[in-house]
Amino acid sequence: MDKIFVEEAVAELHTLQDMLRWTVSRFNAAGLFYGHGTDNAWDEAVQLVLPTLYLPIDVPAHVRESRLTSTERLRIVERVVRRINERIPTAYLTNKAWFCGLEFFVDERVLVPRSPIAELIETQFEPWLTEEPTRIMDLCTGSGCIAIACAHAFPNAEVDAIDISTDALMVAEQNVQDHGMEQQVFPIRSDLLRDIPKDQYNFIVSNPPYVDEEDMNSLPEEFEHEPELGLAAGTDGLKLVRRILANAPDYLMDNGFLICEVGNSMVHMMEQYPDIPFTWIEFAEGGHGVFMLTKQQLLDCADEFALYRD
């Protein structure tokens, strides 16, 4: 960003509303990609500016007329410059992200939370969940946001939060502590299900790496700051999903089910496995590429994935 813009902003903008407006203008001019928790310049500006000032993102309208100190303005401008010049997702600049209305710590060890699975948690997995769950598995937990949101939604359930990345699990553990969930959410290191004892869960929810090779080669710059381990999944994006489908029934109660996100790789799923009765979930709030299979359906198609059993 031109130095003159920076100097003008610090010198001439005075209120919180001034900074929000200026930030939106700069984001629009820069042609940023939005997809890490927001989908427009205004929401992106709110999620950058307010946490930078240690304010909640839902401050009352009259607070936006508050005057800022020059130090506060400079801190905001510095982050705006980094967001534009380095294409760093806002959540990594503020170390804050929101999922299911809950705040989480994030940094470049984990993906920024953005899964449409949030909508399923908020509706308590209706109509598939027919009883109060006692055991839930979040497979490929990353920051722990899905596991923790499930724990909030189902306070009587124990939630195992599984990931292969020790870096990600450190972030998940911090979030578990921040939410006071140490007695309910349990981060566990495992290569998918390989190192997990065969226990019975009401359901497994998974947002694994699923980006195929073609998409990996064309992702916007913002994604370069996220851990590749959490994104890439081979030529067709299904490298890990096949293993999940092969092994998940061993961990489900008889009336259990699997919820799994595959994003754009749903195209490959439908092409390669046309006879599997995936329930592709429609989201009122946007999103796609999430399927549901019951334990019985997984058992019925076990031969399709026998080669991928652990």
From Swiss-Prot:
Which superkingdom, per the lineage? Answer: Bacteria
Q: Write out the GO biological process terms.
A: methylation
Q: Which UniProt keywords apply?
A: Methyltransferase, S-adenosyl-L-methionine, Transferase
SUPFAM superfamilies, sorted: S-adenosyl-L-methionine-dependent methyltransferases
Q: Which InterPro entries match?
A: DNA_methylase_N6_adenine_CS, HemK-like, Ribosome_uL3_MTase, SAM-dependent_MTases_sf, Small_mtfrase_dom
Enzyme Commission number(s) of this protein: 2.1.1.298
Q: According to its UniProt entry, what is the function of this protein?
A: Methylates large ribosomal subunit protein uL3 on a specific glutamine residue.
* Assigned protein family: Belongs to the protein N5-glutamine methyltransferase family. PrmB subfamily.
Tell me the protein's name. Ribosomal protein uL3 glutamine methyltransferase
Query: What is the species of this protein?
Result: Aliivibrio fischeri (strain ATCC 700601 / ES114)
**What lineage does UniProt assign to this protein's organism?**
Bacteria, Pseudomonadati, Pseudomonadota, Gammaproteobacteria, Vibrionales
